[in-house]
Each structure stands twice: as C-alpha cells, then as structure tokens.
Amino acid sequence: MQLSVKLTANIDGLPLTAQKFEAAAPRKNITLFCLPGGGLSKDYFDLAPNFSFAARMSALGYDVITMDHPGVGENLLPADHPFYTPREAAGYLSQALTHWDMQGEIQTPIIGIGHSLGGMMIMLMQGLHAPFTRLGLFGSSAGGLDWGLSDEEKAYINKPHAFARELEAMSLAKFGRATIPAGKGPSGESITFGGQTPELTQRLRAAASEMNAAGAMMSMMRGSFRPEANAIAVPLFFAFGDHDIGIPPKDVPKDFPSAPSTKTVILGATGHNHFAFSSIEELCEAFDGWVGD
C-alpha cells in the first residue's frame, strides 16, 4: 500500500496543502516536487495502478510531493481574493516549500517536476526563487502555444514586460473570469489529449480541475516568462510525447541559455498527458537514470 501524508502550510493567510508519498527503501534522500498541467489536479501524478508517477518514483527511492496550484483543487482561495499572477503563485509555492523544509517535513535536495502549465510554474519558481537543483519538464516549454492566441494577443509575443502589464485585462477578456471552472476532460477521440485506453481517458476526466486564467494566458504566450527562463541555471530534463503539443522538441532547449545541460526524451505512441500511456515506464526509468548521472 502506498504510504502518503498530507502537508499543510499557511502562507500570508492562505492555507495550502500538498500530498507527500514516502520513498521506499533504499531511500535516495531526494524530493520530487510535482505540479500538474492546467485543468488537472494533483491526482494526475497518481492516475491509476501502474500509471502512477508518484508510486513509480517513490518505489525508486524518491519522496514525491504532489500539489494543486494556488486557486484550484484543494488549494482554492477565498472568493474575495484579489486577482493574482502566476509569479505571485510561484511565490506562494516557494514559501510553502521553505516552510516544509524548515519544519523538517521534506528532504533536500528538491527536484522540480512540472507537466504542461505546471512546468511553467516550476520554471517561474526556479527563475525567481531557485528552490530546485534540477528540473523535469514534461510536455512543457517556454515556447508558448501560438495557435491558441488571437491576432491581437500575438502582438505581445516576446514582449514579457508589456505582456505583464496587460496580463489581468487579457486573461479576463479571453476567459471571462479569473478561475476557469473544471471541464469535462478529454473526449478520447484524439491521442493528443486522451489516454491510451478508454479507462485511462476516464481517469484523466476524473482528475479534471479548475484552471487559473492568468496561468493559462501566460503559458500560451511565447516569451512571457523569458527573464525567468534565462535565469534557470540547473540541469533540465525534457519529455515529450510524439503526439504532444507546443513547439518542436528540438527547439525547446534554446530558450534556456544558462542551463548547464539538457536532456530530451521523446515517448513513442504518447500524447500530451504522458502518465496515461504505457510509456510512463520508459519516462520514469529515463528520469531516474538522468538524476543518477
């Protein structure tokens, strides 16, 4: 049976929680801090038997922390909370990690793991606060999603400071609200967003969650967090499905000029939600090998 415990922190009056999956022996004394993609809860990292990143990595000796983004899932904010940006959310998350470290509740070093929009949040945390010694970015890059932008929005590509000034207005104009309600999840008609089987696609639907509009807007805008990407100076591990979204994987490392090394893995017969495919085994083995290099 998988052993897990709940972690709690109060950050500037905001209660935040996470789930910690305890490492099996022999322990590596390394923590993986994991953030899900937009529209998914932390349950994405514990999707189903044999399709659980948390279970696989804890069996390999890592402590694994999974956490919902501030404002969604178990970490909903008060209805009257002011509009907040992904950079502010990255600050909340980094403060929570510091709190748990000071309380002796987590092992260091910590490796940041992010899927899709969660990868952007991990990059913001590292670029602004540097809590991690390595980053694992799954289906995530700094290249944005140009196809998700209107012509008017595209005018802000590679203009991070101008975009930051307009982020609130653009997010509310595009999505109509600060928090996007949970959707129904993937239809299963496409490998890109579905799972390998109808059952795994259903598990993705069950893991659906709210999404922060500003986070969605920022993750789609190429160059929106270029200063943070430029500042990342730790080794990077990228994983993409061969039916993933975003810019070509070969172009992704170019946005991280300060990273001392990068490794890219392409998962065959895999969509954007990697853990819903049997290639999760290849992904976990490759990641573990990279950490041990």
Residues of each region from the PLM?
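Conserved alpha/beta-hydrolase
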Residues: P49-L76
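Alpha/beta-hydrolase
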Residues: E153-H243
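N-terminal cap/lid segment of alpha/beta-hydrolase-fold proteins
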Residues: M1-A24
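Glycine-rich "HGGG/HGxG" loop immediately N-terminal to the catalytic nucleophile
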Residues: D68-Y84, H272-N273
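Conserved loop-alpha-helix segment in the C-terminal half of the alpha/beta-hydrolase fold
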Residues: F240-T270
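Alpha/beta-hydrolase active-site loop
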Residues: F83-Q103
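Short, surface-exposed "cap/lid" segments of acyl-processing enzymes
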Residues: P26-A59
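Catalytic histidine-centered segment of alpha/beta-hydrolase-like enzymes
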Residues: T270-E281
